């Protein structure tokens, strides 16, 4: 079926198996040895998968500086061999890495310029890019769009029995529910992902979600109970969260949450109202308004009203 590439295909699949079973060292050893073979054969599809896995292993083990240049290295190979159809997946790979590094500007640029349009006919070759797009929606706070796209893909993946992608979709659907504060729905979606992950031993698929997987699993275990499988993922996800603390943090999550009163005062600030006018609107003394304003400045890490309004606009608080 795969001809001369069969050995490389097998070794890449085996490397993924090692990785999912939390053996990053042997996965990296195997996939790194396969890359020169794929380059010699100019098999860009297999080469892309191999280099993307290599990049993932490096990034998730805290080697961000070594991982980032791989995107341009793959891009150079694509240009040289003419496999332009892989460009969509490559651009998505860069956006995926930006999610882990907390680089929202790169994520937003990819969404606006290169991300596939899920409102058109879904193209299976873009499945990787669709999965990345769900993550990007989650990062910028568009939870409903993330959930809609995940449900679209789940319908297709169930029919095609693509269990690894299906597991990821259920997990991302749980992610969207968690971000939206719907924890019962989160547990339902996460349970579906866990059922598949446990059957096929997709340990890293879930653990690589880091701090948010920890948050989801803690809530899940309180409601549905714990077992050795979820405990193992919880430990590994905690390690990822420590190495990559900014992964999937929405802009507002970088700052201490504002109280309801502080949010209301901040909105009046954005309208250009004076402290006197805000005091009248909120039926509070000027001193009280100024006290709450100081709390806003401290939480948003700014020094004055204009900076607070600007920061709130950047982080989606207004």
Question: Which role does the model predict for each range below?
Answer:
Residues 1-13, 38-53, 65, 78-94, ...:
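Alpha-solenoid helical repeat architecture
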Residues 31, 71, 78, 108-112, ...:
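Inward-facing hydrophobic residues that define packing positions of alpha-helical scaffold repeats
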Residues 14, 54, 94, 133, ...:
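Structural register within alpha-helical repeat arrays
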Residues 245-294, 298-299, 307-318:
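Helix-turn-helix DNA-binding segment
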Residues 132-139, 148, 175, 179, ...:
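Linker/hinge segments immediately adjacent to helix-turn-helix/homeobox DNA-binding domains
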């Amino acid at each position: 079926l795969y001809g001369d590439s069969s050995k490389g295909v097998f070794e890449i699949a085996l490397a993924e198996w090692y990785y999912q079973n939390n053996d990053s060292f042997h996965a990296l050893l195997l996939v790194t040895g396969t890359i020169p073979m794929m380059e010699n054969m100019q098999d860009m599809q297999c080469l892309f998968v191999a280099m993307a896995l290599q990049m993932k292993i490096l990034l998730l083990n805290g080697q961000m500086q070594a991982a980032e240049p791989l995107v341009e290295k793959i891009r150079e190979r694509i240009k040289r061999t003419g496999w332009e159809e892989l460009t969509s997946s490559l651009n998505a790979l860069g956006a995926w890495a930006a999610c882990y590094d907390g680089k929202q500007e790169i994520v937003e640029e990819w969404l606006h310029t290169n991300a596939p349009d899920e409102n058109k006919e879904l193209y299976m070759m873009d499945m990787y890019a669709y999965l990345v797009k769900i993550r990007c929606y989650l990062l910028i706070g568009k939870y409903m769009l993330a959930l809609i796209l995940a449900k679209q893909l789940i319908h297709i993946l169930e029919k095609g029995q693509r269990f690894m992608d299906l597991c990821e979709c259920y997990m991302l659907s749980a992610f969207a529910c968690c971000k939206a504060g719907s924890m019962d729905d989160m547990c339902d979606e996460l349970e579906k992902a866990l059922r598949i992950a446990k059957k096929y031993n997709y340990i890293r698929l879930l653990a690589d979600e880091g701090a948010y997987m920890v948050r989801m699993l803690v809530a899940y275990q309180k409601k549905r109970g714990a077992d050795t499988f979820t405990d193992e993922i919880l430990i590994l996800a905690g390690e990822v969260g420590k190495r990559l603390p900014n992964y999937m943090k929405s802009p507002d999550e970088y700052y201490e949450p504002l109280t309801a009163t502080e949010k209301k005062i901040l909105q009046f600030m954005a309208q250009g109202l004076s402290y006197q006018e805000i005091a009248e609107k909120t039926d509070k003394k000027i001193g009280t308004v100024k006290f709450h304003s100081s709390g806003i400045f401290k939480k948003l890490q700014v020094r004055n009203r204009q900076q607070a309004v600007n920061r709130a606009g950047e982080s989606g608080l207004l």
